[in-house]
Amino acid sequence: MRHYEIVFMVHPDQSEQVPSMIERYTGIVESNGGKVHRLEDWGRRQLAYPINKLIKAHYVLMNVECGKDELDELESLFRFNDAVIRNMVLGRDEAVTEPSPLARSQEKDEEEGGRTAEA
């Protein structure tokens, strides 16, 4: 099995569907012995440029270990799901488990926000 980093963006009007989409995609990966090493829901974020006249999208990052068949199934689900406006799959040499820079900055902001609220 190989390691992959997957980022997909969901239409902002479909944000309530994201948890069920994540559950479905992780189920596909884990169905034949694959693993999800990292899963981050980045939430609704500003796009760098408009896509289909949208300026925001709901981002999800997954680092997975799976076979080619599971990856093909995921890519076809992304392609035929109208709620997914963009997706990117990158091959990785090894599993990535540490938090992404975006997740680290969000954790740092939350910690600083908690400290100022206590003061």
UniProtKB/Swiss-Prot annotation:
Question: Which PROSITE patterns does this chain map to?
Answer: RIBOSOMAL_S6
What are the start and end residues of every segment in region (Disordered)? Answer: 96-119
Per UniProt, which keywords does this protein have?
Ribonucleoprotein, Ribosomal protein, RNA-binding, rRNA-binding
GO cellular component annotations of the record: cytosolic small ribosomal subunit
What InterPro entries would the database entry show?
Ribosomal_bS6, Ribosomal_bS6_CS, Ribosomal_bS6_sf, Ribosomal_S6_plastid/chlpt, Transl_elong_EF1B/ribsomal_bS6
| A Pfam family hit | Ribosomal_S6
Q: Which Gene3D superfamilies does this chain map to?
A: 3.30.70.60
Recorded superkingdom: Bacteria
Report the HAMAP family cross-referenced here.
Ribosomal_bS6
Relate the protein's function as given in its record.
Binds together with bS18 to 16S ribosomal RNA.
What protein am I looking at?
Small ribosomal subunit protein bS6
The organism of origin for this protein: Alkalilimnicola ehrlichii (strain ATCC BAA-1101 / DSM 17681 / MLHE-1)
Its ancestry begins with:
Bacteria, Pseudomonadati, Pseudomonadota, Gammaproteobacteria, Chromatiales
Per UniProt, what is the name of the gene that codes for the protein in this document?
A: rpsF
